[in-house]
């Protein structure tokens, strides 16, 4: 399975953001570029949250996504948030994955509304990666807001859990891209 983008164009008013963008993603890959170059717009088009001016996107089948805004259920714990999409995921499995990304027992007991920004990012990333039904993954700046020492653990979890699914990880962080070791497409 592949995500195929063909001649995608998008402008905001008279400002072009994407011009005849073409790309085939059949494995985990990184989309890099400076802030404001259209990376998030591209993800929003892939997910059907925004329309392109022209061009086509095919193959975004049953996606799981991490957005720049964390979209956790605030009243649930981080583990309960993971279990929402991780059908068959046990509470013990969810807590084990969260502990691997630095969660303590006390933090595991908190509702998502009381977690720090970095904790929410880690939980949102794991929720997407553990989504058993997802055939594609779209991850928008998933390591933003994480402490530097946790980024390596988050990268390792991303590589392990994404597997070979077509995955697009958007970042402007060259260090994270290098740690992933995935092919990079510059925008």
What residue ranges belong to the model's regions?
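A short, flexible loop at the N-terminus of ABC-type nucleotide-binding domains that lies
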Residues: 1-21, 51
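Helix-to-loop junction immediately C-terminal to a conserved catalytic motif
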Residues: 47
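Q-loop/switch helix immediately C-terminal to the Walker
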Residues: 69, 75-93
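Conserved ABC ATPase "signature" region
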Residues: 91-107, 129
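Walker B catalytic motif
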Residues: 111, 141-142
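Conserved ABC ATPase signature
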Residues: 111-115, 119
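Hydrophobic anchor residue at the start of the ABC signature
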Residues: 125-126
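ABC-family nucleotide-binding domains
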Residues: 140, 147
């Amino acid at each position: 399975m592949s995500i195929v983008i063909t001649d995608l164009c998008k402008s905001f008013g008279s400002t072009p953001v994407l011009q005849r963008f073409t790309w085939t993603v059949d494995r985990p890959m990184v989309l890099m570029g400076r802030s404001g170059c259209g990376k998030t717009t591209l993800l929003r088009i892939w997910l059907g949250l925004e329309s392109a001016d022209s061009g086509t996107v095919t193959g975004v089948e049953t996606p799981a996504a991490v957005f720049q805004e964390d979209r956790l259920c605030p009243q649930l714990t981080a583990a309960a948030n993971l279990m929402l999409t991780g059908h068959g995921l046990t509470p013990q499995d969810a807590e084990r994955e969260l502990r691997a990304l630095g969660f303590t027992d006390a933090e595991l007991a908190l509702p998502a509304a009381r977690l720090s920004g970095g904790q929410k990012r880690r939980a949102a990333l794991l929720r997407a990666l553990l989504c058993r039904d997802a055939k594609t993954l779209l991850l928008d700046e998933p390591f933003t807001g994480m402490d530097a020492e946790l980024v390596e653990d988050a990268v390792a979890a991303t590589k392990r859990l994404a597997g070979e699914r077509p995955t697009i990880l958007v970042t402007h962080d060259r260090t994270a891209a290098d740690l992933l070791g995935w092919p990079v497409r510059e925008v």
